[in-house]
Amino acid sequence: MRTTYMAKPNDVDRKWYIVDATDVSLGRLASVVASILRGKNKPTFTPNVDTGDNVIVINAEKVALTGRKASNKIYYHHTGFAGGLKSRTAGNFRDENPEKLIETSVQGMLPKNSLGHQMALKLHVYAGADHKHEAQKPEVLDITNLI
């Protein structure tokens, strides 16, 4: 009788991928990146083990917001003080902090537990085309074929 393969944390082979976010829809980009961070693109995927790869997202400032999301979609956060509800539109969010916009979108698609937090640490987002991970020799991932 065959048994289901369960990956061990020591057996995981991690790769580095680089994704260009230029003119790619935010949600579609986030779903593909979250899938790679979870390791769902590998045959050794195990839900309770972090089998995912590292992902570098460049040109975050050029990510596309379709429709009227740039002006109508609102992101809220609370400071913790009375009357401290803050809001900003997706367009302002992209202009002020494009890295945080993509990180927030991807984290929303990862598990809401300690394993999801561990997966989110493997995401590296940069507003421009420059990044500091050349030594890892990242593999270019054409995201338009995966959407």
Curated annotation (Swiss-Prot):
GO biological process: negative regulation of translation; translation
CDD domains per UniProt: Ribosomal_L13
One GO cellular component term: cytosolic large ribosomal subunit
SUPFAM superfamilies (UniProt xref): Ribosomal protein L13
Protein name as catalogued: Large ribosomal subunit protein uL13
Taxonomic source organism: Levilactobacillus brevis (strain ATCC 367 / BCRC 12310 / CIP 105137 / JCM 1170 / LMG 11437 / NCIMB 947 / NCTC 947)
Record HAMAP family: Ribosomal_uL13 (MF_01366)
PANTHER family linked to this entry: LARGE RIBOSOMAL SUBUNIT PROTEIN UL13M, RIBOSOMAL PROTEIN L13
Keywords: Ribonucleoprotein, Ribosomal protein
Gene Ontology molecular function: mRNA binding; structural constituent of ribosome
Family affiliation: Belongs to the universal ribosomal protein uL13 family.
Task of the protein: This protein is one of the early assembly proteins of the 50S ribosomal subunit, although it is not seen to bind rRNA by itself. It is important during the early stages of 50S assembly.
InterPro entries assigned to the protein according to its UniProt record, in alphabetical order: Ribosomal_uL13, Ribosomal_uL13_bac-type, Ribosomal_uL13_sf
Quaternary context: Part of the 50S ribosomal subunit.
UniProt feature coiled coil, ranges: none
